[in-house]
Amino acid sequence: MLDTLRKRLRSEKGFTLIELLVVMIILAILMAIAIPSYLSFRDRANRSAAGADLRAVIPDVEAWFSDHGTYAGMTPALLKASYDQSINTTMYTITSLSATTYCVQATSPNDTTKTAAKKGPSAQIVIGATCP
């Protein structure tokens, strides 16, 4: 009888419920580590893309000023920005427009906002400035 039981156990193939549960627990632990890392990586990439797009828009803003002699009347749609339009995830807002000042805000999909402002005709462009 014992020999019959041993032969039967050897002939049965497959995984036990415990083995399957152990594999599922290991996969859950790996996913618990990987998913937050991936989301963090994606957020950093979006912030970096927003900053790069903002730096690409600034020459177009200055070109507008060269052509028109003022920043007034400028809109994001009128700019010929060379930012990455294949992704097109960054939204731009232009505020505080006057003849000599502007503030451009680039907002990434995770609501990270990067700003660049020029406050005066001979002022430097400040990235990270606060917009009024």
Task: Label the predicted regions.
Residues 14-16, 47-60, 66, 126:
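Extracytoplasmic/periplasmic mature domains of Sec-exported, cell-envelope-associated bacterial proteins
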Residues 12-38:
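N-terminal single-pass transmembrane signal-anchor helix
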